[in-house]
Curated annotation (Swiss-Prot):
Keywords: Biological rhythms. This is Circadian clock oscillator protein KaiB. Belongs to the KaiB family. The KaiABC complex composition changes during the circadian cycle to control KaiC phosphorylation. Complexes KaiC(6), KaiA(2-4):KaiC(6), KaiB(6):KaiC(6) and KaiC(6):KaiB(6):KaiA(12) are among the most important forms, many form cooperatively. Undergoes a major conformational rearrangment; in the free state forms homotetramers as a dimer of dimers. When bound to the CI domain of KaiC switches to a monomeric thioredoxin-fold (KaiB(fs)). KaiB(fs) binds CikA, leading it to dephosphorylate phospho-RpaA. The keyword Metal-binding does not apply.
């Protein structure tokens, strides 16, 4: 019997290679590798190079992290350094993560 695992699709909107952008990406990758290893897809979008994508997704500030799948869409704007706030803000609660680990 195969166990279906959710895949999380995330988009990180940054403005160039600024210290805030680099820090946001590094922090997010750490969270994702520790909590969601193998069950996420992350797309990094530079709004300076792709302003139309930011406009389409109504991104007004950077860094912005958006969880696209599974629904509902959730967004976090600004500092991503607080792991718990990121997980709760994206509706990715610790209990769900731990249940997945126990099912593996």
């Amino acid at each position: 019997m195969s166990v279906f695992k959710k895949t999380y699709v995330l988009k990180l909107y940054v403005a160039g290679n600024t210290p805030n952008s680099v820090r946001a990406l590094k922090t997010l990758k750490n969270i994702l590798e520790e909590e969601f290893q193998g069950v996420y897809a992350l797309k990094v979008i530079d709004v300076l190079k792709n302003p139309q994508l930011a406009e389409e997704d109504k991104i007004l500030a950077t860094p912005t992290l958006a969880k696209v799948l599974p629904p509902p869409v959730r967004k976090i704007i600004g500092d991503l350094s607080d792991r718990e706030k990121v997980l709760i803000g994206l509706d990715l609660l610790y209990e769900e993560i731990r249940e997945r680990e126990n099912d593996s």
